[in-house]
């Protein structure tokens, strides 16, 4: 028993939280079916992505891969295309690898043992708790950002939530206050409370069903919690991007490396500029590395795309392929009407939209 929960009225708290959840729970597509595979897909999608964004992607993904076996048997390019636009592509690569292992090692049944499930690729403590409690009723804690915020306020925890030790502390608290007869609903209710009521800014304390148990509310410091140390400044990376078409209307694209950021996704040719002339560097790169002669116009647009650890500063140059040798991997000349079949990261989807607007005369370079 931790000092936080030693005198905590857990049964009364469970009752008030679960009664509220029964009344107020959102009608979400992944809540209609407790199939372990579908729960797993939804939890992976919901990592670092808003619920409203996930809903249509989840429905389309399940339509395309309705069973674990269907996803396990799918080609990686097809899976990446189905995920296109959600970002954080390592999530779906790990999921794809993990369901393949489930199919071969466990006969297609998601393991209900926490140790076995946690050994699958990409499955961390939160995913273990969420999937196993919701699908199998296993009493494992599911501690995400919402839950850490709720618990920080409930128990007046001032430790930095970015530290692994703080997460472990919260996991232990959940184990001690959990409704063991219905762990899935309890975990889901805590998450829902953080999403709808105990929000990061301007929490609705007066409407909170568990306000009576909240130490931060009693002390008037709810908005000061949780404590999270600021990250260091992210790296800024200037990129020049070329949209190049040949005389037959085919567009030059390339496949990214099989490891690292945005692995195996397609993109338009690009290079880091480091403050140099982007047009000159692009022409030099394409010419020297791939033996292709290109003619670029002036840039049509510049914009930023942020990742968790860096920011791309993209400048887009339209142009044409004049002549050169055959196009070899990782490059490909794709007919324009076939580009939609390739999985592009969000940043390069925007590159294409900006290019099409420019080409149609909707906008001109500044």
Curated annotation (Swiss-Prot):
It is an enzyme of class 3 (hydrolase). Binds 1 [4Fe-4S] cluster. The cluster has a structural role. Gene3D superfamilies: Helix-hairpin-Helix base-excision DNA repair enzymes (C-terminal) (1.10.1670.10), Hypothetical protein, domain 2 (1.10.340.30), Nucleoside Triphosphate Pyrophosphohydrolase (3.90.79.10). Residues 105-133 form the HhH domain. Its cofactor is [4Fe-4S] cluster. The active site is at 43 (proton donor/acceptor). Its EC number is 3.2.2.31. One of its GO terms (molecular function) is 8-oxo-7,8-dihydroguanine DNA N-glycosylase activity. GO terms for biological process: base-excision repair; mismatch repair. Keywords: 4Fe-4S, DNA damage, DNA repair, DNA-binding, Glycosidase, Hydrolase, Iron, Iron-sulfur, Metal-binding. [4Fe-4S] cluster binds at residues 198, 205, 208, 214. The keyword Lipid metabolism does not apply. It holds the Pfam family HhH-GPD. The record marks 144 as: Transition state stabilizer. DNA binds at residues 30-31, 48-49, 86-88, 126, 188, 308. The keyword Iron-sulfur applies. It comes from the Bacteria. It catalyses: Hydrolyzes free adenine bases from 7,8-dihydro-8-oxoguanine:adenine mismatched double-stranded DNA, leaving an apurinic site. Changing residue 43 to Q: Loss of catalytic activity. Belongs to the Nth/MutY family. Base excision repair (BER) glycosylase that initiates repair of A:oxoG to C:G by removing the inappropriately paired adenine base from the DNA backbone, generating an abasic site product. 8-oxoguanine (oxoG) is a genotoxic DNA lesion resulting from oxidation of guanine; this residue is misread by replicative DNA polymerases, that insert adenine instead of cytosine opposite the oxidized damaged base. Shows a powerful dicrimination of A versus C, since it does not cleave cytosine in oxoG:C pairs. This is Adenine DNA glycosylase. It comes from Geobacillus stearothermophilus (Bacillus stearothermophilus). The gene is mutY.
């Amino acid at each position: 028993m931790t000092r936080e929960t030693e005198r905590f009225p857990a049964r009364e708290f469970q009752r008030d939280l679960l009664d509220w959840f029964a009344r107020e729970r959102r009608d979400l597509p992944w809540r209609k079916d407790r199939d372990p595979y579908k729960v797993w897909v939804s939890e992976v999608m919901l990592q670092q992505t808003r619920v409203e964004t996930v809903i249509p992607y989840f429905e389309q993904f399940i339509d395309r891969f309705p069973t674990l076996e269907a996803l396990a048997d799918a080609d990686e390019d097809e899976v990446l295309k189905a995920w296109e636009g959600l970002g954080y592509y390592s999530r779906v690569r790990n999921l794809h690898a993990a369901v393949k292992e489930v199919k071969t090692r466990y006969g297609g049944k998601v393991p209900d043992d926490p140790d076995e499930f946690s050994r699958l690729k990409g499955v961390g403590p939160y995913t273990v708790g969420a999937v196993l409690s919701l699908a199998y009723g296993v009493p494992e804690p599911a501690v995400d950002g919402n839950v850490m915020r709720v618990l920080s306020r409930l128990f007046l925890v001032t430790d930095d939530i970015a530290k692994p030790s703080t997460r472990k502390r919260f996991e232990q608290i959940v184990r001690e206050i959990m409704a063991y007869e219905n762990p899935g609903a309890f975990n889901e209710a805590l998450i829902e409370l953080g999403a709808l009521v105990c929000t990061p800014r301007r929490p609705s304390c007066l409407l909170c069903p568990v306000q009576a148990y909240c130490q931060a509310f009693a002390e008037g410091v709810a908005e000061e919690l949780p404590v999270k140390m600021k990250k260091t400044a992210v790296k800024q990376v200037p990129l020049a991007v070329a949209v190049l078409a040949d005389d037959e209307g085919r567009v030059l694209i390339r496949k990214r490396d099989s490891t690292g950021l945005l692995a195996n996704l397609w993109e338009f040719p690009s290079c880091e500029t480091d403050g140099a002339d982007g047009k000159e560097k692009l022409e030099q790169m394409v010419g020297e590395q791939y033996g292709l002669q290109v003619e670029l116009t002036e840039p049509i647009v510049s914009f930023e795309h942020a990742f968790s650890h860096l920011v791309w500063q993209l400048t887009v140059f339209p142009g044409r392929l004049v002549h050169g040798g055959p196009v070899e991997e990782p490059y490909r000349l794709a007919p324009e009407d076939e580009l939609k079949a390739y999985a592009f990261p969000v940043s390069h989807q925007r590159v294409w939209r900006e290019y099409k607007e420019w080409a149609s005369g909707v906008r001109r370079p500044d």
